[in-house]
Curated annotation (Swiss-Prot):
Cofactor note: Binds 2 manganese ions per subunit.
Binding site for Mn(2+) 2: 80, 108
Family from the record: Belongs to the influenza viruses PA family.
Top-level taxonomy: Viruses, Riboviria, Orthornavirae, Negarnaviricota, Polyploviricotina
Cofactor: Mn(2+)
PTM characteristics: Phosphorylated on serines and threonines by host kinases, including human casein kinase II.
Listed GO MF terms: endonuclease activity; metal ion binding; RNA binding
Origin superkingdom: Viruses
Protein name per the record: Polymerase acidic protein
Length: 716
């Protein structure tokens, strides 16, 4: 490319371009595409101004070879190609003599006929995109913009093209020739792809006063002034050679770029320790529902009425007893709390009119379970700032936990279909704009695939619980309100159904800040015997509360019914996000849409119908130790939805960190798979950043183990 530039452009232009690059600390030998771009831009500016004059009468004329004695003045002042100081001097002098507003950025030309500055753009991309970038950058009504492309297109402010047709045609022809010359030498593709968008840093953004002093104090070593540092930074090209740039920056940095090969990456190290435990705000696969079909009782839709009605469908209650104690808690209190719920529900029955809400008596067991009076007393800072040994509580490091198999089972269950529909067809709200036919069709297909999915049940359950808890937290701040955990669905036959999963009792909730915590006790029905995976239920006290008759293929069997009780907490901001869990539907729909778009652009027609209706085709779902798992399009929809839902249910700082850091490694591995020969430095540091997020969170540990499966198969 460098040779081509020296052959193709006038030596004066080449020299100016080299000077401009050196002024910014760039090397024409390394950044050859930029070198070519600067030469092209200079040449267009000169051609723009060539042969255009203003005669004695002030008229604009074109003179290609005229009388050297004629009194002609150049129509355009060329600003581009001068060194910065000189260029600003010219601009200032024009502004002083003509009264034109001074531009923020150095323009390329000044037009003495139209009395305006002109910004010339030459782009390898779409003219209108580049035009908008330029306009956005200079933000000035007064500077006229004129953009040319290598394909013969042009765009100018208010479609005012300044020059006559023929002059512009000369420029377009020259650009087209440059393009063809490059293409014949195999240079065009790299040149076309190397164009970056306009920088939108204000060139003359003045910093004064304290900020200026702070800026001067915080310069890196070896820089005398902010301007000096700025000029240096402006000269940075991201595709320059990195090692050189880094060693220039500081004597201490010596980054060696190591090639990233198939043998380079190692698997992520998952922590050792006891197996991780369940930490979701409500039970997932282990939940049990007491349900009523076609509810039509008095007060239907009032949660407490619905709950009592559901409780009455079950006849196998028995004297509760503890089958799996909570290691650290006072277990009899959990037992007493459940007995209190049963007793107070019984009391409601005996009243003439059932109330709409129920506040529990503040018994000692509930006060203990809800942490009443447990918070350390808040003291005003003024009263204790003189205490000599004032210090923050020591908090223990979290204990590392190992991956347990239950979380993969939870995820598999979330992807399965249930026999009920949890959302109506229009649940994934309409777009704001009138939705086009295709988008509506996609949404309907997608809804059909996920409406019966267990992950969708979790969404509706989460939305209900969080909404009810946030409402109660605001409406009954001091009360221990009893909140039924309810969901609604439709059976296969389309009959409405109301389900009760259990109850929540909320603690005091004076929530001033988004992060202030409200404690609650959850009590949830289940048929899962906690003794099968005791490690999963570390945070729970589990009672046996009844026997349920189940109809199976071999007839009726009786199974013990358990109640999973635990103390938990949440905050306003967490409840707000919980209420918005329906967004998971939208997120996974968008992921599916991008798959359809990719397929459609290959086939050059909309593939929505084929995508959903071709049942024989399988799609990659994820990686497992067995290899890449594949499944039907419906399975893909449900898997993406389940991932999104679990990201919400198991949201945590560990997940945030893991997602952000592992993505970097993922991109490097993908670059390797695409034969892009990626290089890295400090790969060890990246592994450290990823692995410091692998502590004890079940969902993060599962994602890390999936990531390891991906690494294994990606690098085979």
């Amino acid at each position: 490319m460098e040779d081509f530039v020296r052959q193709c452009f006038n030596p004066m232009i080449v020299e100016l371009a080299e000077k401009a690059m050196k002024e910014y600390g760039e090397d024409p030998k390394i950044e050859t595409n930029k070198f070519a771009a600067i030469c092209t831009h200079l040449e267009v500016c000169f051609m723009y101004s060539d042969f255009h004059f203003i005669d004695e009468r002030g008229e604009s004329i074109i003179v290609e070879s005229g009388d050297p004695n004629a009194l002609l003045k150049h129509r355009f002042e060329i600003i581009e190609g001068r060194d910065r100081t000189m260029a600003w001097t010219v601009v200032n002098s024009i502004c002083n003599t003509t009264g034109v507003e001074k531009p923020k950025f150095l323009p390329d030309l000044y037009d003495y006929k139209e009395n305006r500055f002109i910004e010339i753009g030459v782009t390898r991309r779409e003219v209108h995109i580049y035009y908008l970038e330029k306009a956005n950058k200079i933000k000035s009504e007064k500077t006229h913009i004129h953009i040319f492309s290598f394909t013969g297109e042009e765009m100018a402010t208010k479609a005012d093209y300044t020059l006559d047709e023929e002059s512009r045609a000369r420029i377009k022809t020259r650009l087209f020739t440059i393009r063809q010359e490059m293409a014949s030498r195999g240079l065009w593709d790299s040149f076309r792809q190397s164009e970056r968008g306009e920088e939108t840093i204000e060139e003359r953004f003045e910093i004064t006063g304290t900020m200026r002093r702070l800026a001067d104090q915080s310069l890196p070593p070896n820089f005398s002034s902010l301007e000096n540092f700025r000029a240096y930074v402006d000269g940075f090209e991201p595709n320059g050679c990195i090692e050189g740039k880094l060693s220039q920056m500081s004597k201490e940095v010596n980054a060696r770029i190591e090639p990233f090969l198939k043998t380079t990456p190692r698997p992520l190290r998952l922590p050792d320790g006891p197996p991780c435990c369940q930490r979701s705000k409500f039970l997932l696969m282990d939940a049990l529902k007491l349900s009523i079909e076609d509810p039509s009782h008095e007060g239907e839709g009032i949660p407490l009425y619905d709950a009592i009605k559901c409780m009455k469908t079950f006849f196998g209650w028995k004297e509760p007893n503890i089958v799996k104690p909570h290691e650290k808690g006072i277990n009899p209190n959990y037992l007493l709390a459940w007995k209190q719920v049963l007793a107070e529900l019984q009391d409601i029955e005996n009243e003439e009119k059932i109330p709409k809400t129920k506040n529990m008596k503040k018994t000692s067991q509930l006060k203990w379970a809800l942490g009443e009076n447990m918070a350390p007393e808040k003291v005003d800072f003024e009263d204790c700032k003189d205490v000599s040994d004032l210090k923050q509580y020591d908090s223990d490091e979290p204990e590392p936990r190992s991956l347990a198999s239950w979380i993969q089972s939870e995820f598999n269950k979330a992807c399965e279909l249930t026999d009920s529909s949890w959302i109506e067809l229009d649940e994934i709200g309409e777009d704001v704009a009138p939705i086009e036919h295709i988008a509506g069709m996609r949404r309907n297909y997608f809804t059909a695939e996920v409406s019966h999915c267990r992950a969708t049940e979790y969404i509706m359950k989460g939305v209900y619980i969080n909404t009810a808890l946030l409402n109660a937290s605001c409406a009954a701040m001091d009360d221990f309100q009893l909140i039924p955990m309810i969901s609604k669905c439709r059976t296969k036959e389309g009959r409405r159904k109301t389900n009760l999963y259990g109850f929540i009792i909320k603690g005091r909730s004076h929530l001033r800040n988004d992060t202030d915590v409200v404690n609650f006790v959850s009590m949830e029905f289940s048929l899962t015997d906690p003794r099968l995976e005791p490690h999963k239920w570390e945070k729970y006290c589990v009672l046996e509360i009844g026997d349920m008759i189940l109809r199976t293929a071999i007839g009726q069997v009786s199974r013990p019914m358990f109640l999973y009780v635990r103390t938990n907490g949440t905050s306003k901001i967490k409840m707000k996000w919980g209420m918005e869990m329906r967004r998971c539907l939208l997120q996974s729909l968008q992921q599916i849409e991008s798959m359809i778009e990719a397929e459609s652009s290959v086939k050059e027609k909309d593939m929505t119908k084929e995508f959903f209706e071709n049942k024989s085709e399988t799609w990659p779902i994820g990686e497992s130790p067995k290899g890449v798992e594949e499944g039907s399009i419906g399975k893909v929809c449900r898997t993406l939805l389940a991932k999104s839902v679990f990201n919400s249910l198991y949201a945590s700082p560990q997940l945030e960190g893991f997602s952000a850091e592992s993505r970097k490694l993922l991109l490097i591995v993908q670059a390797l798979r695409d034969n892009l020969e990626p290089g890295t430095f400090d790969l060890g540091g990246l592994y450290e950043a990823i692995e410091e997020c692998l502590i004890n969170d079940p969902w993060v540990l599962l994602n890390a183990s999936w990531f390891n499966s991906f690494l294994t198969h990606a690098l085979k």
